[in-house]
Amino acid sequence: MSRKDDFFNHITEGNKSKGDYITLGSAMLDGETITNAFVNVPLKTLNRHGLIAGATGTGKTKTLQVLAENLSDKGIPVLLMDIKGDLSGLAQPSPGHAKIDERHAKIGLPFEAKSFPVEVLTLSEQDGVRLRATVSEFGPVLLSR
């Protein structure tokens, strides 16, 4: 059995879930996407808090977008703080692109252009639903809960 086959089997066996899950993408080996080697996250392992960290250009925003889209598809509400506006495209279906089709073919997942329910909240005077309280108004006791 080749190294690639061993890797594929390791990923597919390790990503079996008894409950509901979301698929983040496909695993990579030596910089190559392994088609249908899906990376799944069981919904029961996702809690209220998470951290996605990395250097510029490593896919943090795309990871957040994929998580938000998949959770929305499962009916789970998501709150994202998007100061730069990178995730505003969630509200509109993608017009599609050859690179997107190529990437999805490598992953082994079909691409479906669709929009997601988005509610824009704001702390400033910009467009959006104005939040009536700021973080400083909550106080340390409420924030610690």
Segments and roles (model prediction):
Residues K60-Q65, S136, P140:
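Short, charged, low-complexity patches
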Residues L123-R145:
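ATP-hydrolysis module of ASCE/P-loop NTPase motor domains
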